[in-house]
Amino acid sequence: QRWPSPK
């Protein structure tokens, strides 16, 4: 599973 970067 992947999620949007914290940038």
Swiss-Prot record:
Tagged with keyword Cytoplasm: no
GO MF annotation list: peptidase inhibitor activity; toxin activity
Origin superkingdom: Eukaryota
GO cellular component: extracellular region
Tissues with expression: Expressed by the venom gland.
Protein localization: Secreted
Keyword annotations of the record: Hypotensive agent, Metalloenzyme inhibitor, Metalloprotease inhibitor, Protease inhibitor, Pyrrolidone carboxylic acid, Secreted, Toxin
Post-translational modification Pyrrolidone carboxylic acid, affected residues: Q1
GO biological process: regulation of blood pressure
Keyword hit for Secreted: yes
Function recorded in the entry: This peptide both inhibits the activity of the angiotensin-converting enzyme (ACE) and enhances the action of bradykinin by inhibiting the peptidases that inactivate it. It acts as an indirect hypotensive agent.
Family: Belongs to the bradykinin-potentiating peptide family.
Protein name: Bradykinin-potentiating peptide 7c
